[in-house]
Amino acid sequence: MLEFPKLEIPIQKITTGDVEIFLKREDLIHPDISGNKYWKLYFNVNNYLEGPGKNPLVITFGGAFSNHIASVAAFGRIFNIPTMGIIRGEELEDHFFENYTLKRAFENGMRFRFVNRADYREKELLMAELQKEFPEALIIPEGGSNLQAVEGVKFMLTEQTKDFDYLCTAVGTGGSIAGISRYAVEKQNVIGFTVVKDSGLKQKITELNGNSNFNLVDADFGGYGKISDDVVRFINNFWQEYNIPLDPVYTGKMMMKLFQIKEEGYFPKGSKVMAFHTGGLQGIEGANQLLKNKNRNTIDIRL
């Protein structure tokens, strides 16, 4: 069972002045299942483990650099439960060992099925077929975003977080912002920094949390998983100034956009803004691999 962490998650002040920005270090929650991934899995896997059948199996979905895939694989290794990843992109099948995230997931015991992008988009059909093939399996959607994940995310909110005017998180599949906006206190403004181009994202989040008490800000900076030189530069400068590592797909882009809108006057003077560091630092290795192959500057963080 995933235990409730004994660690009190630190909240670090990043900037002062007319608008104060803080970062809640959810990335420190677990060395392998970090950040929001821990809380998204918390109820999903614990409820499943209360009564698994004779053939327990956890199946989930993701792309080549998915933090969720990495976390589920680590969970399987820790609890000795088989895991399977349904991976977007059949072209990866013959050389997935060249991809840091998938290589690490495989070494943690996860087995893969690679599907083409057209079939991958039909996830509801895929999930139904998998449930028929593996009737005792726990099947978790892409990014871990379902109603049990939303319930788990409530633990990211504590007595400490109630004093902030704004709560900010990166948004991929929408589970984290659904939980944060659902369980935030009434006075708080919730902002999601979207790192994907998805016109249906707001509707998906609303379906998960039951309301639309949040705002979305575009922070994809060229597209999901696309890493510009500006993003690399920001992450390196942030590391030098605050000694806090950021990943290039989620939290790095969120913090870069957060700093931008702060300078543009988005927040009223006197605002207290808290952003959630949702982990994903395993992605730095794979990102640097791609950047090196293109002879570009890399993320200079040694964890």
Question: What do the PLM-derived regions correspond to, one by one?
Answer:
Residues 1-303:
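PLP-dependent amino-acid enzyme catalytic core
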